[in-house]
């Protein structure tokens, strides 16, 4: 299956390009109170090392806005301010922030939006029109309810409003908590404009539910060439948001990065402690950013076949096993020695690629 991405306009959030030919960026949002400067910076640091590209923060009042200015000065990542209800906070934050997200369902009048646009235009920063099925403007929800039709009307209305103000540094999100509706919303909007899309399923739930919903919705859209930046929303799971987002990009074939682990589900043929081995391998390889296929198999039935397509592989047997690299056996060892040797081969593979580059 050939992947062909929809060509969108390119904008910039800080030093991160979004749209056009830029890589699909991964975002997250802090769950600290923004006025907690140290706590917010600690979470930003965690996201930075997890591989996030952009971070969004809530701004409820001027205490948050003033704190955000200090956070921005110390942040290693571009920051977006998330604004609801009070457009004056967006105007204030536009002086130092990298991007503004507004919810057209609660930002208020056209005059409010004009003020936000003026502030963002002066700084040259983008605005995300963040349409959410749970907070559609009354004029559209009264006519269409809270479904995709209302979301489309809201998006197009607000796009035109910004364009009429000669503002084009726009990205758009069309979020619902339902995977199918999310897919429909983005698919129907895509032919109507060429602005970059921020993908996400809102209020997706805890790790398990979010992973399922986000994989279905975001994976589906990405395979259709839709999407320029994305967030996997999870209740209270910062690093996991990034990890799952990167996995969706990798397993959809859209953007290769990090380790792809192939492992068997286990059965009665297993004669080794495969479960413990997998846990160790996952933990010890999660820092790797290089695209790498590794295989950890519990018996000989599929192990050698999978190893041929892997960069590094283990084939467990009874009390012993093989370490395989690019289809060639490099070691036959006792079970207790296999994982350490395997991990050493993985690290050597990463280093050898770095030298070639």
From Swiss-Prot:
* EC numbers, comma separated: 1.17.7.3
Reaction(s) catalysed by this chain's protein: (2E)-4-hydroxy-3-methylbut-2-enyl diphosphate + oxidized [flavodoxin] + H2O + 2 H(+) = 2-C-methyl-D-erythritol 2,4-cyclic diphosphate + reduced [flavodoxin]
Q: Which Pfam families does the protein's record reference?
A: GcpE (PF04551)
* Gene Ontology annotations of biological process type: isopentenyl diphosphate biosynthetic process, methylerythritol 4-phosphate pathway; terpenoid biosynthetic process
Classification via InterPro entries: Dihydropteroate_synth-like_sf, IspG_bac, IspG_bac-typ, NO2/SO3_Rdtase_4Fe4S_sf
Q: Which cofactor does it need?
A: [4Fe-4S] cluster
Single Gene Ontology MF annotation:
4 iron, 4 sulfur cluster binding
Task: Name the enzyme's class.
Answer: oxidoreductase
Asked if the Swiss-Prot or TrEMBL record annotates the protein with the keyword DNA damage, the reply is no
Q: Answer yes or no on keyword Iron.
A: yes
What sections of the protein cross the membrane? none
Keywords annotated in UniProt: 4Fe-4S, Iron, Iron-sulfur, Isoprene biosynthesis, Metal-binding, Oxidoreductase
Pathway this chain belongs to: Isoprenoid biosynthesis; isopentenyl diphosphate biosynthesis via DXP pathway; isopentenyl diphosphate from 1-deoxy-D-xylulose 5-phosphate: step 5/6
Write down how the cofactor binds this protein.
Binds 1 [4Fe-4S] cluster.
The entry's [4Fe-4S] cluster-binding residues are 264, 267, 299, 306
HAMAP family from the UniProt entry: IspG
Give the UniProt family note.
Belongs to the IspG family.
Describe the function of this protein: Converts 2C-methyl-D-erythritol 2,4-cyclodiphosphate (ME-2,4cPP) into 1-hydroxy-2-methyl-2-(E)-butenyl 4-diphosphate.
Q: What protein does this entry describe? A: 4-hydroxy-3-methylbut-2-en-1-yl diphosphate synthase (flavodoxin)
Q: Which organism is it from?
A: Campylobacter jejuni subsp. jejuni serotype O:6 (strain 81116 / NCTC 11828)
The upper taxonomy is: Bacteria, Pseudomonadati, Campylobacterota, Epsilonproteobacteria, Campylobacterales
Q: Which gene encodes it?
A: ispG
């Amino acid at each position: 299956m050939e992947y062909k991405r929809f060509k969108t306009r390119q904008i910039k959030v800080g030093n991160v390009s979004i749209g056009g030919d830029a890589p699909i960026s991964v975002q997250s949002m802090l769950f600290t109170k923004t006025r907690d400067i140290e706590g917010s910076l600690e979470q930003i640091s965690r996201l930075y090392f997890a591989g996030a590209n952009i971070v969004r923060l809530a701004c409820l009042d001027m205490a948050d806005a003033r704190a955000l200015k200090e956070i921005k000065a110390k942040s290693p990542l571009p920051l977006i301010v998330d604004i609801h209800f009070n457009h004056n906070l967006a105007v204030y934050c536009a002086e130092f922030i990298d991007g503004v997200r507004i919810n057209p369902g609660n930002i208020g009048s056209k005059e409010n939006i004009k003020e936000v646009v003026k502030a963002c235009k002066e700084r040259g920063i983008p605005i995300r029109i963040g349409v959410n099925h749970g907070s559609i403007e009354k004029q559209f929800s009264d006519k269409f309810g809270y479904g995709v039709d209302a979301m489309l009307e809201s998006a197009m209305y607000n796009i035109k409003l910004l364009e009429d103000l000669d503002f084009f540094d726009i990205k758009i999100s069309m979020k619902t908590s339902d995977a199918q509706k999310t897919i429909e919303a983005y698919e129907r909007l895509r032919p109507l404009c060429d602005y970059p899309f921020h993908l996400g399923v809102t209020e997706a739930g805890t790790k398990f539910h979010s992973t399922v919903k986000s994989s279905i919705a975001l994976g589906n859209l990405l395979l259709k060439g839709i999407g320029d930046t994305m967030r996997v929303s999870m209740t209270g799971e910062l690093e996991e948001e990034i990890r799952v987002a990167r996995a969706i990009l990798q397993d959809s074939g859209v953007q290769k990065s990090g380790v792809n682990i192939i492992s068997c589900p286990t059965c009665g043929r297993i004669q080794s402690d495969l479960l413990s081995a997998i846990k160790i391998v996952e933990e010890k390889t999660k820092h790797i950013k290089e695209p790498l296929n590794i295989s950890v198999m519990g018996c000989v039935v599929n192990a050698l076949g999978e190893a041929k397509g892997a960069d590094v592989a283990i084939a467990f047997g009874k009390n012993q096993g093989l370490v395989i690299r690019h289809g060639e056996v490099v070691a036959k060892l006792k079970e207790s020695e296999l994982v350490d040797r395997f991990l050493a081969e993985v690290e050597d593979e990463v280093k050898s690629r770095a030298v070639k580059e």
